[in-house]
Regions:
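Membrane-lumen/periplasm interface segments of specific transmembrane helices
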Residues: 27-108
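Transmembrane alpha-helix segments characteristic
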Residues: 35, 119-130, 134-159, 175
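Alpha-helical transmembrane segments of integral membrane proteins
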Residues: 6, 25-33, 142-153, 168, ...
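Membrane-interface catalytic loops of GT-C/OST-like multi-pass glycosylation enzymes that act
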Residues: 46-49, 114, 138-143, 158-172, ...
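Hydrophobic, aromatic-rich transmembrane alpha-helices
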Residues: 16, 95-140
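Membrane-interface helix-boundary motifs at transmembrane edges
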Residues: 17-25, 134-142, 188-195
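Perimembrane helix-loop-helix junctions
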Residues: 7-35, 178, 184-186
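Hydrophobic/aromatic-rich transmembrane helices and adjacent perimembrane loops
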Residues: 2, 6-7, 154, 162-186
Length: 198
């Protein structure tokens, strides 16, 4: 799912360490493994639809006979987004978030509402926590912040695009756990202790 795209941010830290340490062989191995891992996904997309990342038509590399027409692929992309927002009419695709968010939220189950609110609060808390690291108000744990930021960015991306719970429930549940868990760990173990793991 495209809602998992931000997980690629987790590769930033190891990449910086490898390149900074001039470990070119290891860098090549990991890049190769990444390509080998992603290749079946892309091949499958092309064989089924003619598009590298269906239904997104911004990357148009192949001209094959079975290619789904661009207009139909664009329609599918919009239909997926409005469906996630609780609508069935594709003409409502351009509605601003301020118009559809409250209606979407009302349709959620009680526990899902609670977790969405907790996830939103965790994003706000992470902004304050991250600013505190940047300005040196508390200990800098950049690796932890990268993990927290990746999860929070994935939640925000899911929420702003196509927030059907089954597409992004992992980000809804993980955001409060990872953000608040990391902050709690930093408070309980400001020096030493569990911080060695980060």
């Amino acid at each position: 799912k495209l809602s998992a795209a931000f997980i690629l941010l987790l590769t930033v830290y190891p990449a910086v360490c490898l390149v900074g340490g001039r470990k070119w062989k290891e860098t090549g191995v990991y890049l190769g493994l990444g390509v080998v891992t992603a290749l079946p996904f892309f091949i499958r997309n092309v064989l089924i639809s003619g598009w590298l990342v269906y239904p997104f038509t911004q990357i148009d590399l192949f001209d094959v006979a079975w290619k789904i027409p661009k207009g139909m692929a664009d329609y599918d992309a919009r239909e997926i987004q409005v469906w996630g927002r609780g609508y069935t009419d594709v003409l409502q695709y351009d509605l601003p978030m301020s118009r559809w968010l409250s209606g979407w939220f009302q349709t959620l189950a009680g526990s899902d509402k609670l977790f969405v609110v907790l996830a939103a609060v965790s994003v706000a808390a992470l902004l304050v926590y991250g600013a505190g690291m940047v300005f040196g108000w508390w200990e800098r744990r950049w690796t932890l912040l990268l993990v927290q930021g990746t999860v929070a960015a994935s939640f925000v991306f899911w929420l702003c695009t196509s927030p059907l719970m089954r597409y992004g429930c992992v980000w809804v549940y993980l955001s409060p756990a990872v953000v608040f868990g990391g902050i709690l760990e930093a408070v309980l173990y400001p020096a030493g202790g569990l911080q060695a793991a980060w």
